Design a protein with these regions (language model features):
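A short glycine-centered flexible hinge/capping loop motif at secondary-structure junctions
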Residues: 42-46, 250-254, 291-295
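A contiguous, mid-protein "functional segment" used to position or interact
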Residues: 271-311
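Small/polar, glycine/serine/threonine/aspartate-rich low-complexity segments that form flexible
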Residues: 90-109, 115, 138, 151-191, ...
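Long amphipathic alpha-helical coiled-coil segments
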Residues: 82, 86-87, 287-297, 330-332
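Generic long, charged, amphipathic alpha-helical segments
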Residues: 234-247
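Short histidine
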Residues: 256-268, 299-305
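Periplasmic alpha-helical coiled-coil/stalk elements that build and connect Gram-negative outer-membrane
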Residues: 1-112, 221, 225, 245-248, ...
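Sec/SRP-type N-terminal targeting helices
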Residues: 3, 26, 50, 54, ...
Length: 337
């Protein structure tokens, strides 16, 4: 599950960076056309050098972003190769990457049920540690009671070289052991095991609370980045329209060149914001998937022991229903003696 989330994060990071390069190149092309027009007007004496240098500065600044983004793209590709167990280099699966980011279906989570938390391996591990430590109390308490052992032996002896047995001996009987004089040590051991149980219970609670926090944080990010998508999309379209109007009014002499440069900057900024928010929304969904232990749909938790392993173990030993029992979420501590 963690590996799947890591692969998804790197993959969509790669696709986002590809789109950022595309946005930068498109905006650089727009700014280059403005620079060419401004340079021609400057040579004809119709524009000042200030307008020319401003157009050149904006164009070159945007163009300089492309190598940086291309470097990030290669790093993401190499990271993805490493996760997939490959040497750094081309990843054939990335050759046919679709251009737009996918649309994520609406995620609805009304609460965080306990069964959802129990999907997480850290929470399940903490729960099993509680169960294991709870059993240690019973083991320690068993020393309060006497232990009965059945002993027996059978022997033969012979005084001849042929080895024919002449004397046969059989002995059998019970043995009783009771550490009655170690009562204080036994009591303190029970207390020690109970204290350790309480410690594992607190660790389990902390694991569950941390898991619930991570799920809630990721869910909030999913909701809020989703709410931003429509306004940012409209803002980017408005920026495109604003640039078209600015270019038209500038050519007709109603606006100065600064307004055109401003419109170009706004278009680049809004296009980047829309893309980065879409990417953040996908990342939030991946984080939610990971925080919820593999999804948020209420489905049965995987078996404690895989079927094949369980069958092998049951063939060796009579386990009863222990290997099929659900994972305990809490344990009864009992009273320490």
């Amino acid at each position: 599950m963690l590996l799947s989330a890591q692969v998804a994060t790197l993959y969509y990071g790669y696709r986002t960076t590809l789109l950022r390069i595309d946005i930068a190149q498109k905006n650089a092309a727009i700014q280059k056309r403005s620079l060419d027009i401004t340079e021609r007007l400057f040579l004809e004496g119709e524009e000042s050098e200030l307008d020319l240098q401003q157009a050149k500065s904006q164009y070159l600044g945007t163009l300089a972003l492309v190598p940086e983004l291309e470097s990030d793209l290669v790093k993401l590709r190499n990271a993805l190769s490493a996760v997939l167990g490959r040497m750094p280099g081309d990843v054939p699966e990335l050759a046919s990457v679709p251009a737009p980011l996918p649309t994520v279906q609406q995620v609805v989570i009304t609460d965080v049920p306990a069964k959802l938390l129990m999907r997480r391996r850290d929470v399940r591990t903490a729960a099993w540690q509680v169960a294991a430590q709870s059993a240690q109390i019973g083991i320690a308490q068993a020393d309060y009671f006497p232990a009965i052992t059945l002993l027996g032996s059978i022997g033969w002896s012979s005084n001849t070289i042929s080895g024919t047995p002449e004397v046969r001996s059989i002995a059998a009987g019970p043995a009783l052991t009771w550490n009655i004089l170690d009562y204080g040590r036994i009591r303190n051991n029970v207390r020690l095991q109970d204290a350790r149980l309480q410690q594992t219970i607190e660790l389990f609670r902390n694991s569950a609370l941390l898991a619930a926090q991570e799920i809630d944080d990721a869910a909030i990010s999913v909701v809020k980045t989703g709410e931003q998508q429509a306004p940012l999309h409209d803002a980017a379209r408005a920026a495109e329209r604003s640039l078209d109007l600015a270019n038209t009014l500038y050519r007709e002499g109603y606006l100065d060149f600064d307004r055109v440069l401003d419109a170009q900057r706004v278009l680049f900024t809004q296009a980047e914001r829309e893309l980065l928010n879409d990417s953040a929304h996908i990342s939030a969904v991946i984080t939610l998937y990971k925080a919820a232990g593999g999804g948020w749909v209420d489905m049965p938790v995987d078996a404690v022991v895989p079927d094949a392993t369980r069958e092998t173990m049951e063939a060796r030993t009579k386990w009863g229903d222990l290997l099929r029992a659900p994972l305990p979420a809490t344990a009864d501590t009992g009273d320490a003696k």
